[in-house]
């Protein structure tokens, strides 16, 4: 074989080896790109989820703020009504001697006993009780 043929065979061998090296590198880069795309997709999903959570949180915060404003207004109105009641009671106490005596008198024993709760040793000893926040039922019914 001539030298030219040997050089061509060596060059062809190097070209084939280079081709296999480039093919391997291409496969490696493709796998790396797929992993990066998967990570980016996961991050995009996380970003979307966080944006939705932020939107929900902001909506709730707005609703809570409006509810707080309404409750503050109700509290202010209740305080005004309570102050007006106190003024009325004070005025009536100053104007009416009978009302002043009634207001200052002790409650009758029967009424006082309604507000007292006997101690219970266990649950079976206690009758069903009404919570303090609920009014007592009318005894005449």
UniProtKB/Swiss-Prot annotation:
InterPro entries from the xrefs? Answer: Phage_P2_LysB
Q: What is this protein called?
A: Probable spanin, inner membrane subunit
GO BP, sorted A to Z:
killing of cells of another organism
Question: Region annotation Disordered: residue ranges?
Answer: 119-141
Please tell me the species this chain comes from: Escherichia phage P2 (Bacteriophage P2)
Report the GO terms under cellular component.
host cell plasma membrane; membrane
Q: What does this protein do?
A: Component of the spanin complex that disrupts the host outer membrane and participates in cell lysis during virus exit. The spanin complex conducts the final step in host lysis by disrupting the outer membrane after holin and endolysin action have permeabilized the inner membrane and degraded the host peptidoglycans. Host outer membrane disruption is possibly due to local fusion between the inner and outer membrane performed by the spanin complex.
Stretches of the chain found on the membrane's Periplasmic side: 18-141
Q: Which residues cross the membrane?
A: 1-17
Major location category of this protein: host cell
Keywords, sorted A to Z: Coiled coil, Cytolysis, Host cell inner membrane, Host cell lysis by virus, Host cell membrane, Host membrane, Membrane, Signal-anchor, Transmembrane, Transmembrane helix, Viral release from host cell
The UniProt record lists the keyword Ribonucleoprotein: no
